[in-house]
Amino acid sequence: MIKLRLKRFGKKKEASFRIVACNSTSRRDGRPLQELGFYNPRTKETRLDTEALRTRLTQGAQPTDVVRTLLEKGGLLEKTERPSIAIGKAKLEKEKLAKAKTKDEENDNSKVESEGNEAES
């Protein structure tokens, strides 16, 4: 599978990145199939080879999350809402508490109904 991802270069603590097309199993800084652009996070400079990127995308190349956002800003991809993969522990605990409360309420309601049925008979 071909991936569109960032290849790091530059000095220590002054990183810049090239947007490259490479095999998904190759190393981060290994030899790419094709260089498609440039991104400097310090100056926010971005250069994209739009024709080559469109060609790779039509061939089925999958961009990484960071490259996807760069392509969305560059106008090559439509913005999409991606669901969060990781949910915080606090949010999970809140959901568990809410489920437990609803189960307790259901149990209380069923007890009241069963007591009412016993009193009638």
UniProtKB/Swiss-Prot annotation:
Keywords assigned by UniProt, alphabetized: Ribonucleoprotein, Ribosomal protein
GO CC terms: cytoplasm; small ribosomal subunit
Region entry Disordered, spans: 97-121
SUPFAM superfamilies, per database record: Ribosomal protein S16
GO BP: translation
One of the record's GO molecular function terms: structural constituent of ribosome
Stored HAMAP family: Ribosomal_bS16
Protein name: Small ribosomal subunit protein bS16
Organism of origin: Prochlorococcus marinus (strain AS9601)
Gene that encodes the chain: rpsP
